[in-house]
Amino acid sequence: MKASELFFPTLREVPSEAEVLSHQLLLRAGFIRKATAGVYSYLPLANRVLKKIMNIVREEMDRAGGQEVILPIIQPAELWKKSGRWEVYGDEMFRLKDRHNRDFALGPTHEEIITTLVDADVHSYRHLPLLLYQIQNKYRDEIRPRFGLMRGREFIMKDLYSFDIDEEGLDISYHKMYEAYNRIFQRLKLQYRVVEADSGAIGGNESHEFMVLAENGEAEIVYCKNCDYGANTEKAVCSLEEPKVTEEEQLELEKVHTPGQRTIQDLVDYMNIPKEKQIKTLIYYADEELVAAIVRGDRELNEIKFKNVLGCNQLFMADETAVKQLCSAGFGSLGPVGLPLKTYIDLEVSQMKNFACGANEDDYHFINVNLGRDFTPAGINDIRNAVAGDSCPVCSAPLYSMRGIEVGHIFKLGTKYSEVLEANYLDQKGQEKPMVMGCYGIGISRTMAAAVEQSADENGIVWPLPITPFEVIIVPVNSKNEEQMQAAWSLYEEFKQEGLETIVDDRDERAGVKFKDADLIGIPLRITIGPRSLQEKQVEVKKRSDKDIELVPLDAVSSRVKLMLKEMSK
């Protein structure tokens, strides 16, 4: 292919709206262009990458027994209301009405549609198990679309749904998908880790995330080097450690004047009370009810865990106006003593004695607060974020942390949807039973962005070989030089015969511009044809991931390039 005919408008400057590396580089390298907030056009280079990702995904889904379908993007509200998720999804769901004033949604996911589809035509155990998948655009009305393809309002996903007769069958389907996902990300040549995860709005009782590792990853995961345990911080179990001081005498509750002291650090500085001897009191709306969550002063509340404990649909922090109306004190002066709310404390807080907290009065704190004597919580639960250094819940070894990007998520749904949507089958005894389901998603467009985040350098993208838009770029230094162009097209034809995906940069540009664009786009191998090397019947061969340049005789270029690509594919 000729670069002069390829639509890839590159940019020299970093676009001001691009916050993360993948967003910057995909814009600069001419892979994507923004249509509106969170919605992007995929240009030819991106389309080539996406197709390669999709092909690998399709091959592994087919290998695992999946059958591809195409499901509707526009979904009737009745199905979502029947499942109970019309309200659960809240403002994240795009909703629309037709000319008859009937409600519809742009599908953020397809559990309702696929369950109804299968229910209509599958009635016997003889037709199960069944694995159906699609690769489709999905839509979520993110409150703040950010980070390019990482958090958009329109995105490309593969989702597969499994239908089995029982939990044992689901275990088999789940294991098939678990192994298929591992093969997919291994074939994509991405460094990744599988971690336990929360099921979120999808529901279900077991799930795993496949996280591409990246320094700038959006999510933090914790893992154990001593065993196979790993989880994202939404799911990671925080184990209770034995208290260092098993017996500590309860001291008398005391109210102290703390003018202007509103933060945990303020109290450390003002009264020399360590963070570990303080608590944070956070007020939330759980649907429409105000509740309080309490964690140790040096910890962070895990909102996902807290939401799961409460079993609510919506959880969001109360504003300071609502808090002041409740207890006449603002943020930084709150505490559980006398607080007229249901209060939930983290497990760690249940071990604390003689700790400090706000007195529900501005500029005052309590010290020597004790559970039971001074307040009684509505619940004691694991509601904090796990951090590096915590004990592994499996083997008690210390946990480590790293950052990653979620690109795959698999769920055991059980009968969550089949029961409410009445997707039943007749078993061998003629008894009607609900199908047992699983759900398995991969973010296709997100995987492309994650690959950029993981491998890019200061010069641009460095594509893994399996998903690069082209394998080789041939760069004649002077496109007006007939000898250089003749050598370029001769090599191109050789590579074409060998099945290598090649592009010739025949543009009338300076050599420096061509080199910068080649690095920016991230093609694995660059062959440079210049006057000096050509005079010696040689060309320069350079890997995108290396700085070294290798001089290769013209008659050996094809074999050398094939060998280099073979080595890169290992």
Curated annotation (Swiss-Prot):
Record EC number: 6.1.1.15
Any one of the GO BP annotations: prolyl-tRNA aminoacylation
UniProt entry tagged with the keyword Aminoacyl-tRNA synthetase: yes
Function according to Swiss-Prot or TrEMBL: Catalyzes the attachment of proline to tRNA(Pro) in a two-step reaction: proline is first activated by ATP to form Pro-AMP and then transferred to the acceptor end of tRNA(Pro). As ProRS can inadvertently accommodate and process non-cognate amino acids such as alanine and cysteine, to avoid such errors it has two additional distinct editing activities against alanine. One activity is designated as 'pretransfer' editing and involves the tRNA(Pro)-independent hydrolysis of activated Ala-AMP.
Gene Ontology cellular component terms for the protein in this record: cytosol
Family matches, as CDD domains: ProRS-INS, ProRS_anticodon_short, ProRS_core_prok
Class of this enzyme: ligase
Molecular function (Gene Ontology), one example: proline-tRNA ligase activity
Keywords, sorted A to Z: Aminoacyl-tRNA synthetase, ATP-binding, Cytoplasm, Ligase, Nucleotide-binding, Protein biosynthesis
Self-association and partners: Homodimer.
Protein name per its UniProtKB record: Proline--tRNA ligase
Main location as per UniProt: cytoplasm
